[in-house]
Amino acid sequence: MNWKLTDNKNWDSLEQQFRWVQDMNFVMQHHLHHEEGSVAVHTRMVLEALQQQPEYRALPAQEQEILWTAALLHDVEKRSTSVDEGNGIITSKGHARRGEYTARTILYRDIPTPFHIRENIAALVRYHGLPVWIMERENPVKKLCEASLRVDTRLLKMLAVADIQGRICKDKPALRKLPSYSRCFAVNRIAGERHEALQRVMPAFSTFKRRMGI
């Protein structure tokens, strides 16, 4: 029997079931990256975009539940990290890291979840922004390697694409650079076999570096 966060995925029902979903309505975002408004509006758009992806629809039912739950939780801790800098500029540094902790807590304390499912969801929340912003990191290849040891990068790529599609923003064309190196994020790690996983992933890293000129 597959694990599910909930049987009722209607947004109004989600708000009634989970206080942290209600909280999303009161968290605004940077006007440049999120003209759509609150975290609640963005999250709903992300969920809709995710469910329209052919790759998502082709996943086994359990993986769909894992990815859907990660999408619902991906910005949950913007509520605690958002700072209004003025002029529509709102930052939320550290929301992914804190969101990982919150996701893990919810899926342990509030909704008892099998360990491997809980950790997969928590890791997706932690790294959800990496495919979009990786080239701004000091060592992008190292970051990609780090993520591949913790998260199913096929699912991470799908989540990142939905995160881009599920927003209204002026810089959306720039964000669409993701597909140009999405193959690197589609390399799946082998759970519990890190050495073999690295051997499989490193050729993709080399291709990635050549394409990006790094």
Enumerate the predicted regions with their spans.
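Charged substrate- and nucleic-acid-binding regions of tRNA-handling and nucleotidyl-transfer enzymes
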Residues: D152-I214
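Alpha-helical structural motif
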Residues: T6-W20, V39-H42, E63-E65, H95, ...
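Acidic/His-rich, divalent-metal-binding segments that scaffold phosphate/diphosphate chemistry
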Residues: M1-E85
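Short secondary-structure junctions and interdomain/linker hinges
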Residues: M1, L5-E15, V21, M28-H31, ...
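Phenylalanine-focused residue identity feature
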Residues: F18, F26, I111, F115, ...
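Divalent metal-dependent catalytic cores for phosphoryl transfer on phosphate-bearing substrates
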Residues: E55-D171
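Proteins with a high burden of low-complexity, intrinsically disordered sequence enriched in S/T/G/P/A and R
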Residues: M1-R19, H30, H34, V83, ...
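Hydrophobic, Leu/Ile/Phe/Ala-enriched alpha-helical segments that form helix-helix packing faces
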Residues: L50, A103, L107, K209-M212
